[in-house]
Amino acid sequence: MIVEVAKSYLGQEEISGNKGFKSKDFEKKMKEVGFSAGQAWCAYFSELVWKEAGQDIKPFSASAFKTYQNYEKAGRKGVTKPEPGALVVWRSVVNGQLQWTGHIGIVIEAHDDHFVTIEGNTNDKGGREGIKVAMKKRSYNWKADKGLRLIGFINPI
C-alpha cells in the first residue's frame, strides 16, 4: 500500500522556495503532517505517505536523520537492504564532512545493485533541495553521492 500511495503523488510541485504547493489539496495534506512555508519537505512527504498507508508515524521528525534516529530508538533498527515501502535516509556531506541536514524518501523497488525511490523536495540532479515529488534510481553507495551519504533504511511493518 505504501508504494501505491507514494506513486499517487508523483509530479506534485512546490511553489518556488518551499513556499507551498501548486495543488491546494496536496498542500492541505502536507500541512496536516506539520509542513509550513519555508521548510524543506522531504520528511513531511514521507510521513504523509506512511500515514496514509497506515504505518506508525510517531517517530517522524521534520529532520530526515532525526526521523531515522527516532525509529531506531523506538526499536525499528535500520537495515542495509530495503523492502518496498521502506524509508531511505541520507545525510548531507559538505567538504567531506557529514552534516545534520539530510534527505529521506520511499523505496518502491529494491534490487541487488540499486533501488528506486519516490522522494519529495527533490530535483532532476537528485539532490536534497528540489521542486517536486519525483522517482529516482539510486545506488547503494555508502559514501557521498551528489552531496548525500546513504545512512540506511527503515522497513515498514
Locations of the language-model features?
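Low-complexity, Gly/Ser/Thr/Pro-rich intrinsically disordered linker/tail segments
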Residues: R138-I157
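Residues that form generic nucleotide/phosphate-binding pockets
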Residues: V5-Y9, K29, T67-A74, P156
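Tryptophan-centered motif/residue detector
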Residues: W41, L48, R76, W90-S92, ...
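...with weaker cross-activation on analogous glycine-rich loops/strands in unrelated enzymes
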Residues: V3, Q55-G127
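A short macromolecule-binding patch
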Residues: G126-K137
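Intrinsically disordered, low-complexity boundary segments flanking structured domains
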Residues: G75-G78, M135-N141
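Helix N-terminus capping/helix-initiation residues
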Residues: G20-K24, S63, S139-N141
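N-terminal capping segments
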Residues: M1-Q55
